[in-house]
UniProtKB/Swiss-Prot annotation:
It comes from the Eukaryota. It comes from Cycas revoluta. GO terms for cellular component: extracellular region. This is Blight-associated protein p12. Keywords: Cell wall, Secreted. Its main location: secreted. It is found in: Secreted, Cell wall.
């Protein structure tokens, strides 16, 4: 599963 805004997003 993958989100549009990964952990690199704040």
């Amino acid at each position: 599963i993958v989100d549009y805004c990964p952990a690199g997003c704040r």
